[in-house]
Amino acid sequence: MAERVLTQRELNRATLARQLLLRRVRLPVVRAVERIAGLQAQLASTPYIGLWTRLEGFRPQTLERALEARTVARGVLMRGTVHLVSSSDYGLFGTALEVASPGWITPEAEEIARRAAGSLRAYAAKPRTRVEILDWLEREHGIASDGTNRIWYALRLQARIAHAPEASLWRAPVHGPSFVSVEHNEVESEAARGELVRRYLAAFGPATRAEIAGWSGMKVRDFADSLDGLRLLRDEAGRELLDVPRAPLPAADTPAPVRFLPKFDNVLLDRRRVLPEEYRKLVVRKNADVQPTFIVDGLVAGIWSFKDGHVTTEPFAPLPRAAKRELEDEAGRLAAWLR
């Protein structure tokens, strides 16, 4: 049987559907965050906006309660970037990504972190500052910080240390972010990598092996043995695409409503699918600073800002009258929610 070929527009609609951007849904926060494989969260506020644009009736207090209950966690995961995920996924994804430590993390730092991880989880059961954790490491294990981020970064990965809830609350002033260990079930490394691949495809697919690697930070060889049971498809260029069976593949003409995305939203990572090349430099600035954007008919069409109680939009090109009205209506709803 010939492999199905998907057009660029069909791939666009597939990703939007899986990222809950074709229609808002009613889901508990933890389930929603798991459904979309987490949210980038360099800024504590961005997951709140990302969930508002995806969930019907979302209120900031809902996510705050999940943070305080420690059913979600905000910490370093894919590509060494801060993400908000469920606490269960924090352990699963962290185990899968142990093979993907940045090259600047030395083997010595990784070994130190492995030795200290178990006792650090207990020490960080209540919030600790970075200084407290490094002082503890020297006091309990006789290991002084080397003056770089190597040991600190390795500790956060190995011990599953995340930002404490108070560092991630809506509009909360943060003075000296603190960190806390995340309870999780131990998972075998290869099984964790296979599950991470499937979770990515369910949230962003179909995708190439290179796209899986680009999102996760793993190398293709790290998950090459974890691809059994996946569906094979092709894009218009003939590239092989992987997907989980029975995942949604909406028709190319499926309506895509106007949606506002926060800075660094995950859906922009595969820029070709949602972000037109001619607008890339307007959205992705120096130092990979990704601007808050809005999408019209499934594609990024401009950037937005919020000031003095109002959302201001800057389209990259003139919009059709109907799209402009829809954009204004959605901007009004976002402004009312942000006030």
Residue ranges and their predicted role:
Residues 1-274, 279-339:
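Long, low-complexity intrinsically disordered regions
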